[in-house]
C-alpha cells in the first residue's frame, strides 16, 4: 500500500521536518519506490511537485525537504504501484479544476474491478484506479450540482 502525509493548519506552516522522514520511506526506510508527489495549497492556487523516481533519491524531493514552503493544507503521497506503470502520469496526487477551484486527490489502496462509466468532462490521463476514481467523483459532483458548488449547511 502507498504512504500518505497530510497537514492542515490554522496558520501557514512548512512541512520540512515531517517531509524529511516521509521522504525516506520512499526507498530508504521502506519499500515504496514507485514515485511520489506533494501538493501545497496557496490561496486559490496549488503548488504541486511530482516525480516517478523514489522519493529517497529524488533531487526534487530534496528541494521540497529543504525549501520551507508555507501552506495551510498539504497532501503528500509515496506510491507503491498496484495498477498502472511507474510513470509521471500515474504519480499522485492528481489535480483537476471544478467550479473555479483546484481539487487534489491522493489514494491508498487498490480498487479491484472498479470500472465506472467513462462519461463527462473528467477523464484520466494515466491508467491508475485512483485517478479513475477521482475523475468519477468529480463527474458525479458536476452532474449532481450543475449550477456550481453547493452552499455549506448552516
Give each language-model segment a name:
Residues 1-59, 74:
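Extreme N-terminus nucleophile/cap motif
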Residues 2, 103-113:
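Conserved beta-strand-loop-short alpha-helix elements that form
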Residues 7-10, 77-80, 107-108:
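Fold-independent oxyanion-binding glycine-rich loops
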Residues 15-16, 48, 84-86, 113-116:
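Short helix/loop capping segments that flank catalytic or ligand/cofactor-binding pockets
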Residues 38, 109, 133:
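Residue-level signal for inorganic ion chemistry
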Residues 52-64, 78-100, 117-120:
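Short acidic (Asp/Glu) patches
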Residues 70-71, 99-101:
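Short coil/turn connectors at secondary-structure junctions
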Residues 112-154:
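Short histidine
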Amino acid at each position: 500500500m502507498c504512504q500518505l502525509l497530510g497537514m492542515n493548519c490554522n496558520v501557514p506552516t512548512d512541512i520540512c521536518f515531517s517531509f524529511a522522514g516521509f521522504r525516506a520511506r520512499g526507498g530508504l526506510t521502506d519499500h515504496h519506490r514507485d514515485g511520489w508527489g506533494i501538493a501545497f495549497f496557496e490561496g486559490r492556487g496549488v503548488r504541486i511537485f511530482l516525480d516517478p523516481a523514489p522519493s529517497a533519491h529524488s533531487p526534487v524531493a530534496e528541494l521540497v525537504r529543504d525549501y520551507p514552503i508555507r501552506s495551510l493544507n498539504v497532501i503528500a503521497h509515496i506510491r507503491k504501484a498496484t495498477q498502472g506503470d511507474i510513470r509521471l502520469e500515474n504519480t499522485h496526487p492528481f489535480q483537476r479544476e471544478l467550479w473555479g477551484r483546484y481539487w487534489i486527490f491522493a489514494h491508498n489502496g487498490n480498487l479491484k474491478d472498479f470500472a465506472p462509466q467513462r462519461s463527462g468532462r473528467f477523464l484520466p490521463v494515466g491508467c491508475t484506479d485512483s485517478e479513475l476514481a477521482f475523475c468519477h467523483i468529480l463527474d458525479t459532483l458536476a452532474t449532481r450540482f450543475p449550477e456550481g458548488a453547493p452552499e455549506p449547511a448552516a
